[in-house]
């Protein structure tokens, strides 16, 4: 037998017959059709809409609307405080690749942003990053270093 589209059949037991509700008691789903005896869920025009709570004020109307809109393409940074640079040698060049190699940063997935938390004791560092906070910029330059912004 050749395999053709008009000769395909489902395996035995793979497809189940549709239940015909309300077609007599011999069919097994006659009379109340498995909907119970009385109540809103047994009436015609069922079921109620999603989120309907029986007339109680529904949850999606009780919760306040959000006052902001999420950014479509937010910028993600690998953030690092200036205090993390204290273990580096004086006069060294600091960029994302060197930080990954030294084990200070685990992944070079996102661009580097320097934050100004903590004190900087390392001297004359050349820091290359995508962004600097104003406090990080002043602390690095006060220690005799330079800040290069990468694009």
From Swiss-Prot:
The record, for InterPro entries, names:
Ribosomal_uL15, Ribosomal_uL15/eL18, Ribosomal_uL15/eL18_sf, Ribosomal_uL15_bac-type, Ribosomal_uL15_CS
What domain of life is recorded for the organism? Bacteria
Q: Where is the composition biased (Gly residues)?
A: 25-37
Q: Which Gene3D superfamilies match?
A: 3.100.10.10
What Pfam families would the database entry show?
Ribosomal_L27A (PF00828)
Q: Does the keyword Lipid metabolism apply?
A: no
| Manganese keyword on record | no
Q: Which PROSITE patterns match?
A: RIBOSOMAL_L15
Q: Which UniProt key words apply to this protein?
A: Ribonucleoprotein, Ribosomal protein, RNA-binding, rRNA-binding
Coiled coil spans: none
Q: Name one GO cellular component term.
A: cytosolic large ribosomal subunit
Q: Which GO terms describe its molecular function?
A: rRNA binding; structural constituent of ribosome
- Spell out the Basic residues composition-biased ranges: 12-23
Tell me the Gene Ontology biological-process terms attached to this UniProt entry: translation
Q: Where is this region: Disordered?
A: 1-57
Its quaternary organisation is:
Part of the 50S ribosomal subunit.
Q: Which family does it belong to?
A: Belongs to the universal ribosomal protein uL15 family.
Q: What is this protein called?
A: Large ribosomal subunit protein uL15
List the source organism.
Synechococcus sp. (strain CC9605)
Q: Which gene encodes it?
A: rplO
């Amino acid at each position: 037998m050749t395999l053709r589209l008009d000769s395909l059949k489902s395996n035995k037991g793979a497809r189940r017959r549709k239940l015909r509700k309300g077609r007599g008691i011999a069919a097994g789903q006659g009379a109340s059709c498995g909907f119970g005896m009385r109540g809103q869920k047994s009436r015609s025009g069922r079921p109620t809409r999603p989120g309907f709570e029986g007339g109680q004020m529904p949850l999606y109307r009780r919760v306040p609307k959000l006052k902001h809109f999420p950014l479509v393409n937010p910028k993600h940074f690998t953030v690092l405080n200036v205090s993390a640079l204290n273990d580096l040698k004086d006069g060294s060049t600091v960029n994302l690749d060197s930080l990954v190699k030294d084990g200070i940063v685990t992944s070079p997935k996102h661009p580097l942003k320097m934050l100004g938390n903590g004190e900087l004791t390392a001297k004359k560092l050349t820091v290359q990053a995508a962004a600097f906070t104003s406090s990080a910029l002043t602390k690095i330059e006060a220690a005799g270093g330079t800040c290069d912004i990468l694009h």
